[in-house]
């Protein structure tokens, strides 16, 4: 993997990652395809939206369909019909959001959410699975503390994350895949600093900021990001895990972050909310019943070129799944377009103006919510 920072504006960075399945311009938003599928979208929909990289999840794919099925297809790309880069999460976040039977330095034993059977996962198994999946970017297996963990619990998770990162790198024997470390530390600046220094001492192809945007105050999210970025190398990509709202992404880009993922755009689409250049729009609301406007007049996606707000309102009113599909198409197109505008604004020196506008319309709740 190669990464080049081509231009900066303050701390915001315009860059490019060269991965096994193609180049990815940064800052970038990665649509989430947890089960080898971005909900309600085909790979062609994603290609038409301009998605350069998507995320899938090791934990879920390990359970169903299982690694052997994906091996039959010679990797995840063939399995899901996606030719561009893929990033796979290690499964750490999902494991630690489930009831655990046992956790120690060796690994984690938990019950499968599918059938209740006991499952064991550790750094070596996570690396083995991700190598078999053939993703372009793999993540180390980390210990993500629960949101209400106290200082000592977060400290223990941070120390374990370091030990597991060492084991992850040792087990990562492959040439065409990149491996990112994950910085933990909760909402404690000293632990964030310690984790960042530990991970960079090992040396990875990129670094993720984990364990944030899980319920803490927005000011803490931004503060901990600043603390973490300060100790990350300039020549490696920085990935904020789970950040997906437009205003948060702009705030994080302004603090030197390059990569983002979230189910936020697709999840709210399924509940009738569109992302627009004027903020969020609730298509279920009755005032859309007679509206002949597109979802967003600035958008050129399939949905906005062909359908009115009135029609999409009707689809949600009658419980037709097409409404969810059309809004999902739109929201992913909006996020990809937003990141293109972010990159253009860094190039042209107008990033502050773009950030100000996006933060204003989304922090105020947007229009017609």
Curated annotation (Swiss-Prot):
Transmembrane segments: none annotated. Gene3D superfamilies: Queuine tRNA-ribosyltransferase-like. Zn(2+) binds at residues 299, 301, 304, 330. Binds 1 zinc ion per subunit. One of its GO terms (molecular function) is tRNA-guanosine(34) queuine transglycosylase activity. InterPro entries: ArchSynthase1/Queuine_TRR (IPR050076), TGT (IPR004803), TGT-like_sf (IPR036511), tRNA_ribo_trans-like (IPR002616). It catalyses: 7-aminomethyl-7-carbaguanine + guanosine(34) in tRNA = 7-aminomethyl-7-carbaguanosine(34) in tRNA + guanine. Its EC number is 2.4.2.29. Residues 242-248, 266-270 are annotated as: RNA binding. GO terms for biological process: queuosine biosynthetic process; tRNA wobble guanine modification; tRNA-guanine transglycosylation. The keyword Transferase applies. It is an enzyme of class 2 (transferase). One of its GO terms (cellular component) is cytosol. The keyword tRNA processing applies. Substrate binds at residues 89-93, 142, 184, 211. Keywords: Glycosyltransferase, Metal-binding, Queuosine biosynthesis, Transferase, tRNA processing, Zinc. The active site is at residues 89, 261. Its cofactor is Zn(2+). Pathway: tRNA modification; tRNA-queuosine biosynthesis. It holds the Pfam family TGT. PANTHER family: QUEUINE TRNA-RIBOSYLTRANSFERASE. Catalyzes the base-exchange of a guanine (G) residue with the queuine precursor 7-aminomethyl-7-deazaguanine (PreQ1) at position 34 (anticodon wobble position) in tRNAs with GU(N) anticodons (tRNA-Asp, -Asn, -His and -Tyr). Catalysis occurs through a double-displacement mechanism. The nucleophile active site attacks the C1' of nucleotide 34 to detach the guanine base from the RNA, forming a covalent enzyme-RNA intermediate. The proton acceptor active site deprotonates the incoming PreQ1, allowing a nucleophilic attack on the C1' of the ribose to form the product. Belongs to the queuine tRNA-ribosyltransferase family. Homodimer. Within each dimer, one monomer is responsible for RNA recognition and catalysis, while the other monomer binds to the replacement base PreQ1. This is Queuine tRNA-ribosyltransferase. The lineage of its organism: Bacteria, Thermotogati, Thermotogota, Thermotogae, Thermotogales.
């Amino acid at each position: 993997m190669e990464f080049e920072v081509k231009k900066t504006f303050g701390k915001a960075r315009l860059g490019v990652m060269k991965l096994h399945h193609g180049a990815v311009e940064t800052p970038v938003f990665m649509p989430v395809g947890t089960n080898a599928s971005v909900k309600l979208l085909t790979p062609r929909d994603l290609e038409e939206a301009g998605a350069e990289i998507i995320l899938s999840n090791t934990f879920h794919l390990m359970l169903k369909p299982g690694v052997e099925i994906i091996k039959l297809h010679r990797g995840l790309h063939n399995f899901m019909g996606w030719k561009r880069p893929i990033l796979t999460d290690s499964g750490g976040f999902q494991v630690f959001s489930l009831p655990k039977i046992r956790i120690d330095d060796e690994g984690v034993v938990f019950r499968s959410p599918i059938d209740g059977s006991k499952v064991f996962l550790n750094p070596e198994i996570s690396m083995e699975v991700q190598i078999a999946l053939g993703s372009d970017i793999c993540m180390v297996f980390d210990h993500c503390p629960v949101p209400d963990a106290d200082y000592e619990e977060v400290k223990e998770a941070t120390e374990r994350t370091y030990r597991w990162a060492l084991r992850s790198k040792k087990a990562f024997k492959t040439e065409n895949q990149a491996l990112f470390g994950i910085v933990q530390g909760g909402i404690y600046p000293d632990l964030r600093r310690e984790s960042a220094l530990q991970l960079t001492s090992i040396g990875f192809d990129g670094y993720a900021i984990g364990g944030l945007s899980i319920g803490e105050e927005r000011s803490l999210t931004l503060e901990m990001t600043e603390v973490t970025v300060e100790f990350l190398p300039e020549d490696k990509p920085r990935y904020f895990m789970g950040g997906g709202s437009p205003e948060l992404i702009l705030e994080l880009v302004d603090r030197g972050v390059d990569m983002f993922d979230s189910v936020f755009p697709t999840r709210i689409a399924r509940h009738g909310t569109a992302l627009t250049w004027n903020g969020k729009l609730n298509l279920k609301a009755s005032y859309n019943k007679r509206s002949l406007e597109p979802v967003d007049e600035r958008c050129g996606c399939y949905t906005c070129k062909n359908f009115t707000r009135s029609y999409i309102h009707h689809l949600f009113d009658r419980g037709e799944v097409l409404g969810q599909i059309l809004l999902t198409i739109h929201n992913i197109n909006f996020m990809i377009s937003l990141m293109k505008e972010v990159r253009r604004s860094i190039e042209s020196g107008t990033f502050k103006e773009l950030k100000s506008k996006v933060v204003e319309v989304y922090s105020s709740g947007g229009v017609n919510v």
